[in-house]
């Protein structure tokens, strides 16, 4: 129950602009993926592959450059290799691993789906405190528990879970001073 309360508390601190930004965050990401690549799936796959520990603006820039040049670069080496495989024609779902990355991919491909991307910010929001680099790993059990908390909170707030995650992410970034 505490997870739901923490998520709801962050949502309640959202400005109108942050709510609007969050509501349209994944549809905008979908449009970016469609614009930078031959298919939305390929674009979303490269964006998702490069996403771990990557600021959003840099992530988009690197994905855009990767498709323009045919060469992925700039991220963690294993993630760059996954992005390159997708650029070279691999199915993103055959390449991408981990609940966070695969869900992020799915949310970009289908911004109105039911997946919740539980990244380090979503985790911190749910537990009610910033962990920096000291947070425990997000294994399958924790991922499922936190995803369920976002789904339940979203039901109470009248928004889709993917929208709630994006809205709270937008608020959290402002509150912790991340652009």
How would you describe each model-predicted region?
Residues 1-179:
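HhH-family (HhH-GPD) DNA N-glycosylase catalytic core used in base-excision repair
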